[in-house]
From Swiss-Prot:
Protein name in UniProt: TDP-N-acetylfucosamine:lipid II N-acetylfucosaminyltransferase
Protein source organism: Escherichia coli (strain K12)
Membership in a protein family: Belongs to the glycosyltransferase 56 family.
Pfam families assigned: Glyco_transf_56
InterPro entries hit by this protein: WecF (IPR009993)
Length: 359
C-alpha cells in the first residue's frame, strides 16, 4: 500500500515546525498516512523532536519540487498532501501533468491563495497558478477561504480544515478572571511580516482612537527585519506618544506571547486576506475581540461560530469594544470548531480523503 506523503514546500520555519509537531503528537500514532514528510529547510532538531515521523529535508524549493515530481511520475498511485503551497515549480508541474490531479491535495494557508504581490514576476505567474488550481484534486481550507476559492474554481472539491494552532484547551476560561478597565491596549498585527501592513494599521488605529490607547506591535518574527522594524517605529512615533507605543523586536516564547495577549483589549488586523489564525485563536481564547478587514474572509468562520466580529470600516470606540468583550465572554469556547482539540476531527477526515480511504 502506498502511504500519503506530506509536503512543506517552502522554508517557513515557524509554521513547518507547528505542523510537524502536531502530526507527531496527535496523528502519527493512529494513521500511517500521517508519518511521511518532505520539507524545505534545515532539520534544526526537528527529527529528534518528532520521532514518530519520517522527515526528508531539502535545501531549497527547487530540489524538493524535483524530488516530488520524480516520485509522482514513478508511481501514479502516490498521493501528496501539500501544506500551504509557495512553490512555483510544483504548481507548474500540476499544470503540465508532471503531477496528476488525483495526486494533488492542497491545504490552503491563506497567503498562497490570494494575488496581492505587485511585482512583475508575480503578475506573470498568477494566471498560470490560477489555471493549475483548477486541477487540484481537493482543497482543504477555512470556510472563508473555501468560499473565496469556489468563486473562481467551483468544480474543485473543497473540505473544511483549520490550521492546527498550538493551544491549551484548559485556558479557554482564562479571560474570566480579568477585569478590563482604564486605558485600552491594542495588538496590531500578528508578526513582523510586511503583509500585516503595520504602518497603515497604526494610522487606522490612531484615526479611530487617537493617542488615547496603548499600541503593541509584535515584530520579533521573521528574523533579520531590523530596517522594517525601525520604519514602523518611526511611523508609530509620529502618531503615538512614546509611552503608548510598544514595538517588540525580539521573538517571544509561547508562554510570554500568551502573557502579552492577556494584557490586550483588542486585536487589530488590517490585511485583506486570511492569515494569522493562530494569533486570532489565542486572542479569542483570552476573551479579546478582533478587528478584521472586511475583505478577510475569516470573518465567515467567526460568525459561523457565533463570535463577535468588528471591522476596520466600523466606527469604533471603547464602549463598542467593551460590548464585544462581553459578547465574547458569553461564548462557550470549548465548542469553537477552529480551536484545539476540535480541529482534530477535520484533520482525521482530511487524511482519509487524501488517502482515498473515504469518498
Amino acid at each position: 500500500m502506498t502511504v500519503l506523503i506530506h509536503v512543506l514546500g517552502s522554508d517557513i520555519p515557524h509554521h513547518n515546525r507547528t505542523v510537524l509537531r502536531f502530526f507527531n503528537d496527535a496523528l502519527a500514532a493512529t494513521s500511517e498516512h500521517a508519518r511521511e514528510f518532505m520539507v524545505v529547510g534545515k532539520d534544526d532538531g526537528l527529527s529528534d523532536s518528532c520521532p514518530a515521523l519520517s522527515v526528508q529535508f531539502f535545501p531549497g524549493k527547487k530540489s524538493l519540487a524535483e524530488a516530488v515530481i520524480a516520485k509522482a511520475k514513478a508511481n501514479r498511485q502516490q498521493r501528496f498532501f501539500f501544506h500551504g503551497q509557495f512553490n512555483p515549480t510544483l504548481w507548474l508541474a500540476l499544470l503540465s501533468g508532471g503531477i496528476k490531479p488525483s495526486q494533488f491535495f492542497w491545504h490552503i494557508w491563506g497567503a498562497d491563495l490570494y494575488e496581492l504581490s505587485s511585482g512583475l514576476r508575480y503578475k506573470l505567474f498568477y494566471p498560470l497558478r490560477r489555471l493549475a488550481q483548477k486541477r487540484v484534486g481537493c482543497v482543504f481550507a477555512t470556510r472563508g477561504d473555501l468560499s473565496f476559492f469556489a468563486k473562481t474554481h467551483p468544480k474543485v472539491r473543497g473540505e473544511l480544515l483549520f490550521f492546527p494552532t498550538r493551544m491549551d484547551p484548559s485556558l479557554n476560561t482564562m479571560a474570566n478572571d480579568r477585569q478590563r478597565e482604564g486605558k485600552m491596549t491594542i495588538l496590531v498585527g500578528n508578526s513582523g511580516d510586511r503583509s500585516n501592513e503595520h504602518i497603515a494599521a497604526l494610522r487606522a488605529v490612531h484615526q479611530q482612537f487617537g493617542d488615547t490607547v496603548k499600541v503593541v506591535v509584535p515584530m520579533g518574527y521573521p528574523p533579520n527585519n531590523e530596517a522594517y522594524i525601525e520604519e514602523v517605529r518611526q511611523a508609530g512615533l509620529e502618531l503615538f506618544s512614546e509611552e503608548n507605543l510598544q514595538i517588540l523586536s525580539e521573538k517571544l516564547e509561547f508562554d510570554a506571547y500568551l502573557a502579552l495577549l492577556r494584557q490586550c483589549d483588542l486585536g487589530y488586523f488590517i490585511f485583506a486576506r486570511q492569515q494569522g489564525i493562530g494569533t486570532l485563536c489565542l486572542l479569542i481564547q483570552a476573551g479579546i475581540p478582533c478587528v478584521l478587514n472586511r475583505e478577510n474572509p475569516f470573518w465567515q468562520d467567526m460568525t459561523e461560530q457565533h463570535l463577535p466580529v468588528l471591522f476596520t470600516t466600523d466606527d469604533l470606540n471603547e464602549d463598542i469594544v467593551r460590548e464585544a468583550q462581553r459578547q465574547l465572554a458569553s461564548v462557550d469556547k470549548n465548542t469553537i470548531a477552529f480551536f484545539s482539540p476540535n480541529y482534530l476531527q477535520g484533520w482525521q477526515r482530511a487524511l482519509a480523503i487524501a488517502a482515498r480511504e473515504v469518498a
